[in-house]
């Protein structure tokens, strides 16, 4: 189907994206500016927690069950207390559901972290938070802004797509 034949769908998509952007702007309008800045500044913690849950493949191990943090930790080879804190953080931001104190299950959001789901975004979470992608942001972003050199190039000595050519495991994750 050509773009011209699909003009209606393109317009609907553009409207949906505009509506989504408007929805995302609501928190900034409803909360005091200092609180919103702190929220943005600490978003890394949420992203990192999500990354660890994806690395551990928590959603797949939970499946359709409700499991205590201790039971889940046993399946994952993790500390029950530490996993419980991680799961509570993720439940607080809506990624999993805490059905009773320290008992968790998947919800509509975490369903897309199942490694065997065809619509899973787990690989994308792993990619975005990988050391390869994190280093440019944490170690080279300021230098890149000052010099005009891409932070990825500063961190890895080559452009992203050249890097992909030389690192097959990362290329598979990227694809």
Task: Tell me what each language-model feature is.
Residues 13-175:
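Conserved Class I S-adenosyl-L-methionine-dependent methyltransferase catalytic core
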